Amino acid sequence: MLRLSAPGQLDDDLCLLGDVQVPVFLLRLGEASWALVEGGISRDAELVWADLCRWVADPSQVHYWLITHKHYDHCGLLPYLCPRLPNVQVLASERTCQAWKSESAVRVVERLNRQLLRAEQRLPEACAWDALPVRAVADGEWLELGPRHRLQVIEAHGHSDDHVVFYDVRRRRLFCGDALGEFDEAEGVWRPLVFDDMEAYLESLERLQRLPTLLQLIPGHGGLLRGRLAADGAESAYTECLRLCRRLLWRQSMGESLDELSEELHRAWGGQSVDFLPGELHLGSMRRMLEILSRQALPLD
């Protein structure tokens, strides 16, 4: 299968925990050592914890938690599950770590996660964000997680200004967060998610294209991709970003407003993420992206 999207074991060392649309990945590093990748949404705390406990008998053996970026749907579990993992170290970029020390940034993460709670749902006890056991990682740094797990940190800005990805050279596996955008499950292509800077977004995709041919590509939403979907992922995402730029500039040349195309993208793309991305927020994010592209895309003439 080109796409693995069911919770459970994905590879001999890899499991998907929780909801496939906002998953947490579990890496078996050795007989008594584990790592998590991606930080999910707060609503799924007990779901992810239950899945974790099916695979890990002793939570003190979870030693690392790798986070790609600061957005609410990639770190929402941290204050709820870190207190249950006494030996865990959270690894994220310096900018991500700083965001968790910002009262305003934390308020946004908590507010957006509260909007996703089920009826009558209450969140478990949490620690303070600034009490998380974090360590900042840098671009190019090698993370020696275990004897068979050596992952490289690669800066991948553009979607956000703090984004990093994690590359396992041994397995040619890339945990890419939202750096490539959102994988369109109906069409098999990438939908751009440029929420910070278009030039940085494209530069990141160019950099990822220079990696050895990937065997596994693991975005922050939707599961694991294999075959050509993995090998050509960064190239496809680059092409689709330029395609959207051309589409936007053409529509503007015809006198259409950003609002019209924002609404169109929201109607076409919003359904896939509706369970964790409220409609109003999705529409606003489409508008934000088009504003960025409008400012930075090369003109048609």
Curated annotation (Swiss-Prot):
Fe cation 1 binds at H69, H71, H159, D178. Thioesterase activity, but not pyocyanine production, is inhibited by 2-(pyridin-3-yl)benzoic acid, 2-(1H-pyrrol-1-yl)benzoic acid and 3-methylthiophene-2-carboxylic acid. Compounds bind to the active center. It comes from the Bacteria. It catalyses: (2-aminobenzoyl)acetyl-CoA + H2O = (2-aminobenzoyl)acetate + CoA + H(+). GO terms for molecular function: hydrolase activity; metal ion binding. Its EC number is 3.1.2.32. Disruption phenotype: Mutant is defective in pyocyanine and rhamnolipid production and fails to kill worms efficiently, but can still produce PQS. Deletion mutant produces increased levels of DHQ, resulting from intramolecular cyclization of 2-ABA-CoA. Fe cation 2 binds at D73, H74, D178, H221. GO terms for biological process: secondary metabolite biosynthetic process. InterPro entries: Metallo-B-lactamas, NDM-1-like, RibonucZ/Hydroxyglut_hydro. The keyword Iron applies. Keywords: Hydrolase, Iron, Metal-binding. Required for the biosynthesis of the quorum-sensing signaling molecules 2-heptyl-4(1H)-quinolone (HHQ) and 2-heptyl-3-hydroxy-4(1H)-quinolone (Pseudomonas quinolone signal or PQS), which are important for biofilm formation and virulence. Catalyzes the hydrolysis of the intermediate 2-aminobenzoylacetyl-CoA (2-ABA-CoA) to form 2-aminobenzoylacetate (2-ABA), the precursor of HHQ. In vitro, can also hydrolyze other substrates such as S-ethyl-acetothioacetate and acetoacetyl-CoA, but is inactive against anthraniloyl-CoA, malonyl-CoA and octanoyl-CoA. Belongs to the metallo-beta-lactamase superfamily. As mutant can produce wild-type levels of PQS, it was originally thought that PqsE is not involved in HHQ/PQS biosynthesis. It was shown later that the role of PqsE can be taken over to some extent by the broad-specificity thioesterase TesB, explaining why the pqsE deletion mutant still synthesizes HHQ and PQS. This is 2-aminobenzoylacetyl-CoA thioesterase. It comes from Pseudomonas aeruginosa (strain ATCC 15692 / DSM 22644 / CIP 104116 / JCM 14847 / LMG 12228 / 1C / PRS 101 / PAO1). The gene is pqsE.
